[in-house]
UniProtKB/Swiss-Prot annotation:
Annotated disulfide bonds: none
Transmembrane segments annotated in the record for this chain: none
Name the record gives this protein: Large ribosomal subunit protein bL27
Species of the source: Streptococcus gordonii (strain Challis / ATCC 35105 / BCRC 15272 / CH1 / DL1 / V288)
Entry-linked InterPro entries: Ribosomal_bL27, Ribosomal_bL27_CS
Stretches of the chain forming a coiled coil according to its record: none
PANTHER family, A to Z: LARGE RIBOSOMAL SUBUNIT PROTEIN BL27M, RIBOSOMAL PROTEIN L27
Record GO terms (molecular function): structural constituent of ribosome
Propeptide span(s): 1-12
Similarity annotation: Belongs to the bacterial ribosomal protein bL27 family.
Amino acid sequence: MLKMNLANLQLFAHKKGGGSTSNGRDSQAKRLGAKAADGQTVTGGSILYRQRGTHIYPGVNVGRGGDDTLFAKVEGVVRFERKGRDKKQVSVYPIAK
């Protein structure tokens, strides 16, 4: 009888295993920035500017939300203005009837 001894057979990979990477993801865009243009007519409650922090400050008839979003308090015309030497603000002026 012919006996085959295959007890010590070991196979090796001909390519190294592909490692993982910590890259390959990105966060969703937050859609920040101006939502109303200078001179545009808006209604009360309209969002004027979405921001993180206070890049632009609230002016006349403009409120600031909890996430620093600027919104119109009254119906009127949007105006982007300077506030002092190095700051900006946005105001809403009611339309004269």
